[in-house]
From Swiss-Prot:
It comes from the Viruses. Keywords: Disulfide bond, Lectin. Disulfide bonds join C76-C158, C137-C150. Residues 48-159 form the C-type lectin domain. One of its GO terms (molecular function) is carbohydrate binding. This is Putative C-type lectin protein FPV239. Pfam families: Lectin_C (PF00059). InterPro entries: C-type_lectin-like, C-type_lectin-like/link_sf, C-type_lectin/matrix_domain, CTDL_fold, NKR-like_CTLD.
Length: 163
């Protein structure tokens, strides 16, 4: 080695140590920010999941797949929801606007020969929008609520209530 010239390896080493330290610190920072703890089941839901649409403290999922009514109920349960009911004219208009084309199962069923309609939770349907048809299971058509045989395949709409 020649006299008076700085050593190249020590200069590189002094540059690598700070750069390496910065990379390690940034990596740890990214890992900390990107990992989230699981949400405990007793925590309230404050926002809609990806693929769901929010309206009036509810989240709605509009399916593209078709199932019979009982499978539609199960699919909603698998997503921690239930088939939607209709609670107001405004909700009815919102759902019609977002559901797209086709018929969609909702959570209203006829429970007796007198034409009494009940929601999935067992409460009475308030006939906010009259249900037309002769079937036992209600669905949304393009403009109204209709009824048909429960075994027929249709799209479906799930709802999760934000707490």
């Amino acid at each position: 080695m020649e006299e008076g010239k700085p050593r190249r390896s020590s200069a590189v080493l002094w540059m690598l140590i700070p750069c390496g330290s910065i990379i390690i610190v940034l990596s740890v920072f990214v890992i900390i920010l990107s990992t989230r703890p699981p949400v405990p089941p007793d925590i309230k839901i404050l926002y809609c999941k990806e693929g769901w649409v929010g309206y009036n403290k509810n989240c709605y999922f509009f399916s593209e797949e078709k199932n019979n009514k009982s499978l539609a109920v199960e699919r909603c349960k698998d997503m921690d929801g239930h088939l939607t009911s209709i609670s107001s004219k405004e909700e009815f208009k919102f759902i019609l606007r977002y559901k797209g084309p086709g018929n969609h199962w909702i959570g209203i069923e006829k429970v007796d020969f007198n034409g009494t309609w009940k929601l999935e939770d067992g409460s009475s349907y308030d006939n906010i929008v009259p249900i037309k048809g002769i079937g036992d299971c209600a669905y949304l058509s393009d403009r109204s609520i209709m009824s048909s045989f429960c075994f027929l395949p249709k799209k479906w709409i799930c709802r999760i209530i934000l707490l």
